[in-house]
Amino acid sequence: MSRVIVIGGAGQGRQVIDAIVARGHHEVVGVLDRSFRRGDVVAGFPVLGTDDDLRAAALETAADSFVVAIGDNFTRGRILERETGAAAHLHPATVVHPAATVARDASLGAGCILLAGAVVGNGCRIGRGVLLGINSSVDHDGWVDDHASLAPNAATGGTVRIGRNTAVGLGASVIHEVTIGADTVVGAGAVVLGNLPDRVVAFGVPAKVVRDREPGEPYLQRR
């Protein structure tokens, strides 16, 4: 059984810990989060330091894997790419809740997270560090690029392309054969009927671009 360190101890981190425990393929040995003090406890597991302490914490606990359980796509991707390969004995763990469904011919990238009820259809490709929230779904032949996310109850039709670092918000829907660019945010409840470019924010039914955005800009802020 792999021994895993969870980076991120807030709400998303606790959900990921529950998924790991429920699946039983990894043993959680500790949490890294700069919002806590070393020795604090998150979801029953000790805080070992901050995300800067991964290699030291891995040596301390004999961990051989890690998962970045942070909701913000840009931050999650930055940490995952920084730490991948930094130590030969550490690799990014892929976490799939036992209540998630993955088609036999779908592929999952290293470090991705599928929470309870997430569905990945036939022929889908899910990139590195992707986060699929509770009850989200990617229909057949979809492609979700590295570090993108679908929030709870977000859904895509078949053959949809979601760009790197892009966030599809709570309950949003994307119809079939649509392409959404990189670093874009689709607001909660939006219905995307056509392609969206890189680095924009889109809201509404149907979804319309309301402004440009910068890569790394916090996407949970208001318009």
Give residue spans per PLM region.
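Short glycine-rich anion-binding loops that position phosphate/pyrophosphate groups of nucleotides
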Residues: 12, 71-74, 208
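…primarily DNA-binding HTH/wHTH and HhH modules…
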Residues: 205-223
